[in-house]
Amino acid sequence: MAFVVTDNCIKCKYTDCVEVCPVDCFYEGPNFLVIHPDECIDCALCEPECPAQAIFSEDEVPEDMQEFIQLNAELAEVWPNITEKKDPLPDAEDWDGVKGKLQHLER
């Protein structure tokens, strides 16, 4: 079972998780990261590294965020792989913790 990036990553895009991933299974969009479910080895190293607490094991994704399981799978097929940490988005602190950010997802 893979890990899943959820709502709170949108418009924050901290990349601390990318830095610790041993299999480079993160993919980067304009304002969101996703995990490729077929590449994730379920090591759980990324989950505690996320300052926004946006990463969950697939079986622990909150009920109101279930759509992110499929979203991660879909976007990982079209976005480029990211393997190194980058600066978060400029207004990440303002968006961290804001609920219901899916409408702000840039594809």
UniProtKB/Swiss-Prot annotation:
Membrane spanning stretches: none
Molecular function per GO: 3 iron, 4 sulfur cluster binding; 4 iron, 4 sulfur cluster binding; DNA binding; electron transfer activity; metal ion binding
InterPro entries, alphabetized: 4Fe4S_Fe-S-bd (IPR017896), 4Fe4S_Fe_S_CS (IPR017900), 7Fe_ferredoxin (IPR000813), Fd_C (IPR022569), FdxA (IPR054829), RnfB_subfamily (IPR050294)
Cofactor entry: [4Fe-4S] cluster; [3Fe-4S] cluster
Pfam families, per the entry: DUF3470 (PF11953), Fer4 (PF00037)
Function: Ferredoxins are iron-sulfur proteins that transfer electrons in a wide variety of metabolic reactions. This ferredoxin could play a role in regulating gene expression by interacting directly with DNA.
Official protein name in the record: Ferredoxin-1
Source taxonomy: Bacteria, Pseudomonadati, Pseudomonadota, Gammaproteobacteria, Pseudomonadales
Disordered, as annotated region: 84-107
